[in-house]
């Protein structure tokens, strides 16, 4: 089921998600609905806050991206595509390398792209849909997507990385989104 997407300036986007404590069929259904919603809106990541839920849950799928990603599981290289989609459930991150600038968009900010400083690599502890912990390290575009979604789970938005001057430069775009005048891109249907 396609869920209603929450756009900027909805207050839920500023809420830190509550930990997930039930790894049941409801969680599995929600994850499936979030994946369908993310695909419908042509995204690579979607946090629970973006569908109006105050949870520590995000879904990511970078398998269709042309941008380079890397993944280490148990310290060994793994094929990124084989581990997509990826679920972040009650995640914690450790940032492992220097920063680089990433040009990012966000489903909650239709049409807006900004440059954001991100760590080149992240170490992640998360849980699978059965509640089992697992650990991995990500680099490249996957690392960026994870950091972007993790920020959502903390109530932080990518515009928070902008200076006051940079925010002033995009003020009209933000006002358009608030007024509902921004156009969302959706998946073509047959």
Swiss-Prot record:
Binding of Fe cation, residues: 106, 148, 152
Any coiled-coil regions, as ranges: none
Gene3D superfamilies, sorted: Peptide deformylase
Keywords (A to Z) from UniProt: Hydrolase, Iron, Metal-binding, Protein biosynthesis
One protein family per Pfam: Pep_deformylase
Metal-binding keyword on record: yes
Entry-linked PANTHER family: PEPTIDE DEFORMYLASE
Co-factor binding details: Binds 1 Fe(2+) ion.
Database matches in SUPFAM superfamilies: Peptide deformylase (SSF56420)
Catalytic activity: N-terminal N-formyl-L-methionyl-[peptide] + H2O = N-terminal L-methionyl-[peptide] + formate
Cited HAMAP family: Pep_deformylase
Enzyme Commission code: 3.5.1.88
Obligatory cofactor(s): Fe(2+)
The protein's name: Peptide deformylase
Function as written in the Swiss-Prot or TrEMBL entry: Removes the formyl group from the N-terminal Met of newly synthesized proteins. Requires at least a dipeptide for an efficient rate of reaction. N-terminal L-methionine is a prerequisite for activity but the enzyme has broad specificity at other positions.
């Amino acid at each position: 089921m396609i869920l209603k997407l929450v756009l900027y300036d909805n207050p839920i986007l500023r809420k830190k998600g509550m930990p997930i404590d039930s790894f049941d069929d409801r969680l599995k259904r929600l994850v499936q609905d979030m994946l369908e919603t993310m695909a419908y809106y042509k995204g690579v990541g979607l946090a629970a806050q973006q569908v109006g839920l105050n949870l520590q849950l995000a879904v990511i799928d970078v398998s269709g991206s042309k941008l380079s990603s890397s993944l280490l599981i148990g310290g060994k290289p793994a094929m990124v595509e084989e581990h997509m989609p990826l679920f972040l459930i009650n995640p914690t991150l450790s940032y492992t390398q220097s920063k680089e600038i990433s040009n990012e968009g966000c489903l909650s900010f239709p049409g807006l792209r900004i440059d954001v400083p991100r760590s080149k690599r992240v170490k992640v502890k998360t849980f699978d849909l059965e509640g089992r912990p697992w650990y991995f390290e990500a680099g490249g575009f996957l690392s960026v997507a994870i950091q972007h979604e993790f920020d959502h789970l903390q109530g932080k938005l990518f515009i928070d990385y902008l200076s006051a001057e940079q925010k002033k430069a995009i003020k009209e775009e933000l006002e358009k989104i608030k007024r509902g005048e921004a156009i969302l891109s959706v998946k073509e249907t047959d």
